[in-house]
Amino acid sequence: APTLVNVVDLKIFENTNSTTLAQGLSFQPGVRVESNCQNCGFPQVRINGLEGPYSQILINSRPIISALSGVYGLEQIPVNMIERVEVVRGGGSALFGANAVGGTINIITKDPISNSFQVSSMFSCMDGQSWEQYMGGNVSLVAKDNSYGIALYESYRNRNPYDRDDDGFSELGKLNMNTFGFRAYYRPTHFSRINLEYHTTNEFRRGGNKFDLQPHESDITEQTKHIINSGGASYDLFWREYKHKISLYGSVQHLSLIHI
């Protein structure tokens, strides 16, 4: 049976001033992104009302995001690395993984197509008390004969804590995040292609109160520090005028987490 795929393209991210995947997904029908903890502020995606563990996050159609990374991963994927996002809702998406009962979110990253570069910066404020700064950049380099190419991206995000009801405890915690990555390809022949990709994220977040003090000196604090390194390689071979294809791939991820 055919499967309905909803696509979130770059126009949606640009028109909504989204800087992360979590912000852009909020504008997709049947998908809700909510903050589940006012201390650590981790986001959770609900598809058709089902909780986050019932959804599968893919990168380039492959499940390389671990379950632990998926808890905070929605905010750790910057918009400037995304070409589009494909959302499949319903039980049919379970073909992509055992936990994809509610749906699947497939992130297609940018492929180097032409020589180009882009730099962006944004400042925002919530209720005049919580400032957020975002800076991002992209560079793409491609050979004249398209035999090889590489796309690099980098983003920086810094957000102050937000206290909506003035009780001294944050509703959104302090956030500082750096992300860097690349995607490259090489074509040994007209019918084969080698792909390499890598990205790293260094994130610090803290929620609670008394942010000017050490965590153990405050009334309540939840603090996490992530260092994530992940990458993958694939080999595609076509024959019979691109009607047939064999694809081999491998991926690895290392997560360092300090949770207080």
Placement of each model-derived feature along the sequence:
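Extracytoplasmic beta-strand/coil segments of soluble accessory domains associated
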Residues: 22-63, 83
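Short acidic/polar hinge/loop motifs at secondary-structure boundaries
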Residues: 44-46, 62-89, 110
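Flexible loop and strand-edge segments within Gram-negative outer membrane beta-barrel domains
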Residues: 159-179, 185-187, 191-245, 252-257
